[in-house]
């Protein structure tokens, strides 16, 4: 999928409200499927295509059920945001020292997460090409 017309008539997992709106506007049918069910949905024909992070594309072995991959290298305007969440009630129940530790660890994970995602963005081409997918 490189241009809106590529989506027409396809069953696509968008993964977010905004992506779902774009898919619908382009003439695609949005199919809500959790990331961990994309593999079986692609295999069974419930989905024709899915949008998800490079990390998920690799870790869920989606190259086994696909023939094509549009990478985020030059065809993307978004980056997958994968936050670490904690309820306000749980956070407020921590001591100030514990809250400080949570914030410090969160900050260190942010850098790690961004770097790991960048590595996966580069690695995905290799994984999908090796599987015989056409990568653009």
Where are these regions (language model features)?
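N-terminal secretory/targeting leader peptides
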Residues: 1-136
């Amino acid at each position: 999928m490189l241009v809106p017309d590529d989506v027409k008539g396809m069953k696509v997992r968008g993964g977010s409200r905004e992506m779902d709106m774009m898919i619908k506007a382009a003439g695609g049918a949005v199919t809500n499927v959790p990331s961990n069910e994309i593999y079986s949905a692609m295999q069974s024909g419930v989905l024709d295509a899915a949008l998800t992070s490079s990390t998920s594309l690799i870790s869920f072995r989606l190259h086994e059920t696909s023939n094509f991959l549009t990478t985020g290298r030059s065809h993307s305007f978004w980056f997958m945001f994968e936050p670490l969440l904690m309820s306000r009630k749980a956070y407020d129940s921590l001591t100030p020292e514990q809250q400080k530790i949570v914030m410090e660890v969160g900050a260190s994970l942010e850098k790690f997460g961004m770097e790991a995602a960048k590595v996966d963005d580069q690695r995905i081409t290799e994984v999908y090409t090796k599987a015989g997918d056409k990568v653009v």
